[in-house]
């Protein structure tokens, strides 16, 4: 998140605001500074809540079609850092620790989602 903060642009969202929509071309990733965001996919049947300190939306920067595969909506007032693809690639090249922190964040979220599906 530190590398994102030094290269990103801060944007605010109110509760209910759509941050991005499934099917859109994604040109940036996000780091959540304050608030909470709901990610949903599969026609809203799947969802995850993102909290301050987490990153989301990076997948669109690394897939060939740069497409969003879900919706992101603010649950509460949010402050979000946005980093475009060019700055993202620069951060990964200049700071391998940035890439490791990003992978750790994604890994943690995948583990939490996996645990949720076991309980269902």
Protein language model features and the residues they cover:
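Cyclic nucleotide-binding regulatory domains
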Residues: 9, 15-77
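Flexible interhelical turns and helix-capping residues at alpha-helix boundaries
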Residues: 12, 43, 92-96
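A short hydrophobic beta-strand segment most commonly corresponding to one strand
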Residues: 78-87
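Alpha-helix boundary/capping detector
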Residues: 30, 39, 61, 82, ...
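A small-molecule sensor/coupling module
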Residues: 1, 68-69, 86-120
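Residues that scaffold the ATP/ADP-binding catalytic core of kinase and kinase-like folds
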Residues: 4, 40, 58-59, 83, ...
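A short glycine-rich, His/Asp/Glu-containing loop-to-beta-strand
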Residues: 1-10
């Amino acid at each position: 998140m530190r590398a994102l903060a030094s290269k990103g642009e801060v944007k605010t969202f109110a509760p209910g605001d759509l941050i991005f929509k499934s099917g859109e071309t994604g040109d940036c990733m996000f780091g959540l500074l304050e608030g909470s965001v709901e990610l949903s996919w599969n026609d809203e049947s799947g969802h995850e809540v993102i909290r301050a300190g987490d990153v989301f939306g990076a997948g669109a920067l690394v897939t060939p079609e740069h497409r969003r595969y879900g919706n992101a909506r603010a649950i509460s007032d949010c402050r979000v850092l946005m980093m475009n693809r060019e700055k993202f690639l620069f951060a990964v090249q200049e700071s391998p620790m940035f890439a490791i922190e990003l992978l750790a964040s994604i890994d943690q979220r995948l583990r939490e989602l996996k645990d949720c599906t076991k309980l269902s």
